[in-house]
Regions:
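Vicinal oxygen chelate
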Residues: 1-3, 12, 35, 70-72, ...
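Core segments of cupin and vicinal oxygen chelate
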Residues: 13-68, 128-130
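Short loop segments at secondary-structure junctions
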Residues: 16, 63-65, 78-80, 101-103, ...
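Residue-level signal for short segments within beta-strands and strand-turn junctions
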Residues: 62, 76-78, 149-151
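Helix-adjacent hinge/juxtasegments
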Residues: 66-76, 81, 86
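Eukaryotic phosphotyrosine signaling hubs
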Residues: 91-95
Length: 151
């Protein structure tokens, strides 16, 4: 029997977390939820297995959800480890997705606020679901964001 669980957040570690928070608020209408976090101490070192870990950031309420919905947690560590730019076929977390009214407009807003395109807009029919217009893009820090429009 499965454990009782509730999905609560997705975490993005950012080089400039305040800039990334602004991006998700301005482009997607996310809103800060709760206080700004400033965390450190033995408990965080134990959880992360990183000595002297210190992180700051905030949770963002996602569009389409109320106060009890999942959040996008955007944090920055004092010490970061750089990695290659994410690709769509990389093992592990690959992208986050937003359903939007108009993919074209959403993509332009994303680009205007510092994001970029990964591929081009495509349309396909998904049997039993509908028609999907979709594109992959990147936020200002290179994380892949899927924009999808269903009809």
């Amino acid at each position: 029997m499965p454990i009782r669980a509730k999905y609560v957040h997705t975490n993005l570690i950012a080089r400039e977390w305040k800039r990334l928070v602004r991006f998700y608020c301005e482009v997607f209408g996310c809103e800060p939820k709760g206080p700004e976090r400033d965390m450190s101490g033995a408990w965080l070192d134990n959880v992360t297995s990183l000595p002297n870990a210190h992180l700051t950031g905030v949770h963002l309420r996602l569009p389409g959800y109320g106060d009890d919905g999942p959040t996008l947690e955007i944090f920055g560590y004092d010490q970061l480890i750089e990695s290659d730019l994410p690709t769509a076929n990389r093992c592990g977390l690959a992208h986050i997705a937003f359903a939007v009214e108009h993919v074209d407009h959403a993509l332009q807003a994303l680009i205007a606020d510092g994001g970029s395109e990964v591929g081009s807009i495509a349309t396909t029919k998904v049997e039993g679901v509908g028609t999907l217009r979709v594109v992959y893009a990147r936020d200002p820090e290179g994380n892949i964001v899927e924009l999808q429009e269903w009809s």
